[in-house]
């Protein structure tokens, strides 16, 4: 426990918070061939691998994921939300932050309905989250 005098002299150091989606904080300068700080809400990338993985206990499923090389040359694992997808290797995707709690190492989501990713078909509720257009009628 510090004394009042010690607090007056030094003060308290504020905690620095770690980013939940660190890959979104960097850009790439191709002239300098170096990473630069360039925070962005989303980033574009190319899928290098598409597959399924099993979640942690007590859940059981085959969750779809894609390994994505971003425009800043960082490679991340991103979750593909919704039922069914059209992604394959070399698909251009847009990712956002947001982890998947039962998949270790997955800290990003792919945005459906943007770039090469199609929206979820036959979706009626919560359409905006899955890139689905309003149905006719």
UniProtKB/Swiss-Prot annotation:
Q: Per UniProt, what is one GO molecular function of this protein?
A: tRNA binding
**What NCBIfam families does the entry give?**
rpsL_bact (TIGR00981)
Give residue numbers for the modification (3-methylthioaspartic acid).
102
Protein name per its UniProtKB record:
Small ribosomal subunit protein uS12
Q: Which organism is it from?
A: Levilactobacillus brevis (strain ATCC 367 / BCRC 12310 / CIP 105137 / JCM 1170 / LMG 11437 / NCIMB 947 / NCTC 947)
Q: Where do the record's region annotations for Disordered lie?
A: 1-23
Q: Which UniProt key words apply to this protein?
A: Methylation, Ribonucleoprotein, Ribosomal protein, RNA-binding, rRNA-binding, tRNA-binding
Report the superkingdom from the record: Bacteria
Question: Which family, according to UniProt?
Answer: Belongs to the universal ribosomal protein uS12 family.
Question: Mind telling me which GO cellular component terms the entry cites?
Answer: small ribosomal subunit
Q: What does this protein do?
A: With S4 and S5 plays an important role in translational accuracy. Interacts with and stabilizes bases of the 16S rRNA that are involved in tRNA selection in the A site and with the mRNA backbone. Located at the interface of the 30S and 50S subunits, it traverses the body of the 30S subunit contacting proteins on the other side and probably holding the rRNA structure together. The combined cluster of proteins S8, S12 and S17 appears to hold together the shoulder and platform of the 30S subunit.
Q: Tell me the HAMAP family matching this sequence.
A: Ribosomal_uS12_B (MF_00403_B)
- Read off the SUPFAM superfamilies from this record: Nucleic acid-binding proteins
According to its UniProt entry, the protein's GO biological process terms are: translation
Q: Which Pfam families match?
A: Ribosom_S12_S23
Subunit: Part of the 30S ribosomal subunit. Contacts proteins S8 and S17. May interact with IF1 in the 30S initiation complex.
